[in-house]
Amino acid sequence: MRSTNNKNIHKTGNLCYTISTFHTEEGTGLEARLNGINRQETLKYLGCPGGPLPKDVLEQLETGEQEILRRAVPRVIWRLFDRGPAGELAGSGFTPAGDDIRYFLKDCDQVILMAATLGMEVENLLRRTQARDMALAVILDAAASAAIENVCDNLCADLAEAFAPRYLTDRFSPGYGDLPISQQEELFRLLDISRRIGISLTESGLMVPQKSVTALIGVSDRPQLRRSRGCAACSMFADCAYRKDGTSCGKP
């Protein structure tokens, strides 16, 4: 884990955010890390079946992944809250809504709110490429999705190490299951996301840059089973605002 002295990391209410490798709060910051793009993740987002790929496709994949790595400026932010008996986050005025999130957090007495983004350079690259080369734009989009997944996975791995011997759940994002996408607004308010790491929120609850993720993570004294994830397993699949916009909430 890339962190400074983490003696205060379990203190609720601390707002911890990083821009690239800059620690903004001594003793609590965890580094925003993009250390690679998983080729299988990129292919998954492209919907490619298994088996060998033509040489020209492999070359495009390599070009696209390297371009995303070059342009990305990862940023992350997170904050810890105690969880009350009714599921409310103490002192926040926010209670995550829906049966799915209540069940997901049922063993947890604390909740981490987090957000991550690849930054506007990646967003602008995707927009420019869509206007001139749609085939390359699709590859770049898939590579960027794999990249933001890497950033989130790295943050979660670092948090798991920092909170040990306690246990963390998977990530659970607004719009996933029956957690309303409208509750993005609460995460933005509590984390001060727009000002801190430069993500804006549209009226429909989608984020710009689009390669951004917000999520809740539970903290428990009990080991947490890894739950089935992904669009196909989501009860909101048919009505998902992310999917209709051609993006996802960032869950694998």
Regions found by a protein language model. Give the residues of each.
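Short, positively charged and aromatic/hydrophobic N-terminal segments
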Residues: 14-21
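Active-site helix-to-loop segments that bind/position phosphate- or nucleotide-bearing substrates
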Residues: 22-132, 136-137
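Conserved active-site and cofactor/substrate-binding residues in soluble primary-metabolism enzymes
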Residues: 56-59, 63, 146, 150, ...
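Conserved mixed alpha/beta catalytic, RNA-binding, or beta-rich assembly cores of soluble enzyme
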Residues: 108-173
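Short terminal or interdomain "cap/linker" segment that borders an active site or interface and mediates
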Residues: 118, 166-242
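Short cysteine/histidine-rich metal-coordination sites, predominantly Zn2+-binding motifs
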Residues: 247-252
